[in-house]
């Protein structure tokens, strides 16, 4: 898959229309947001779509969407930013049921949203059906505002 960065930097036309198409990806800024606000990531290539979302409410925020693919078994990747200035808590729910929870407390080398703080949580083996609501709850800590980039839905072969 041609990269978004290379396409933009080279200015070579994308004759086959492949750049920027990530069918399995749902951008955080495109989800139904409750409390989260969109932020630009600089440089833009350090986040999918050049944007992310942050939560400024101490009680937490949610980002949700409806599953619209074929029913089956899936892995979910949650791409988020883990900064050195806090330990946000994340919870993932499928149709109201808690399926995963973690604290973003890796020791990454930066205090800014970007490539050095971008990390991923994989949740494996979830049975999903069309219409299921997938909801990510982020609870900020310190100066880390439970930042999210995107979610990927990966069908499993059994």
Predicted features along the sequence, with ranges:
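Extracytoplasmic
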Residues: 1-158
